[in-house]
Amino acid sequence: MEKRSLTLAGHRTSVSLEPAFWAALEEQAARRGIALSALIREIDEARAGDNLASALRVAVLGWYRPTS
């Protein structure tokens, strides 16, 4: 697990994720041409009650899940 601290909605928070999830988030932010913090903010604002780490994992899985 890798723990990172960031500011969301004016509050400092820490998130622990596996390195592969951090790498996927960084890759997605780079593809979109936005900062990692901006991507995490978008996911945070869209989540429906899940804790932030879970919401980030679900977002990553959604990007990499095969579509049929």
Positions of predicted regions on the chain:
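Surface-exposed, Lys/Arg-rich phosphate-binding patches that contact polyanionic backbones
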Residues: 20-45
